[in-house]
Regions:
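Hydrophobic adenine-recognition pocket in adenosine-nucleotide-binding enzymes
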Residues: 88
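S-adenosyl-L-methionine-dependent methyltransferase catalytic module, highlighting the catalytic core
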Residues: 82-84, 93-109, 113-186
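Active-site loop signature of alpha/beta-hydrolase-fold enzymes
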Residues: 48, 70, 91, 121-124
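Conserved N-terminal segment of class I S-adenosyl-L-methionine
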Residues: 1-76, 82-84, 98-101, 141, ...
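Alpha-helical hinge/cap motifs
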Residues: 77, 91-93
Length: 187
């Protein structure tokens, strides 16, 4: 899972003493199992039960939650140090993205970090072709509702309340995927 590795590399050590929320973590929260944080939380419509307890130290708090149906994230203001959305952005109806980003901004602590990954827009045709050959999941590709460039994501993050100067991005896997980091203001 290259996106989980990329997200892990982008998280500074000092933030790992706090809380992380992975939006769209899946029924099996792979990224949360493979990252080190004091408290780990995951949201996904596929979640079946409340917590994973590999050990008390690695406990992951999971909540069934559909970001396509809900408008408010079920957490208090400034609750998380880091929030992630790994290969989820493209599955959200584009008209809902900015309001979701405003919610992410609300739930992040001052100087908090939002990390996301998404396929680069130019890969859409390639991914559809690969899905026809069953090299990638056809169901997953059919569920894509939008394609994005890094610049478009940065613009949406700014509309969602993230300061332009605290947004950075790059590419991985031969420029096929985009990573984006947005910080909240220190206040």
């Amino acid at each position: 899972m290259k996106r989980a590795e990329m997200a892990n590399k982008l998280i500074p050590l000092h933030l790992r003493k706090g809380r992380i929320l992975d939006i769209g973590c899946g029924a099996y929260p792979f990224f949360l199992f493979n990252t080190s944080f004091s408290e780990k939380y995951g949201l996904d419509k596929a979640v079946q039960k409340g917590d994973f307890n590999a050990s008390q130290k690695d406990r992951i708090h999971l909540k069934r939650y559909d970001i396509e149906q809900e408008d408010i994230l079920p957490f208090d203001n400034g609750y998380f140090d880091v929030m992630t959305m790994l290969a989820v952005f493209e599955h959200i109806e584009p008209k809902r993205v900015v309001s979701l980003l405003k919610e992410i901004q609300r739930v992040l602590k001052p100087d908090g970090m939002f990390i996301m990954t998404t396929p680069a827009s130019w890969t859409d045709t390639l991914l559809k072709f690969m899905a026809k050959l069953r090299l990638v999941s056809p169901v997953e590709i059919e569920e894509h509702k939008g394609t994005y460039t890094a610049q478009k994501i940065a613009s949406m993050l700014k509309a969602g309340g993230f300061p332009k100067e605290l947004i950075r991005y790059g590419y991985f896997e031969c420029f096929m995927n985009i990573w984006v980091v947005a910080r909240t203001s220190r206040q």
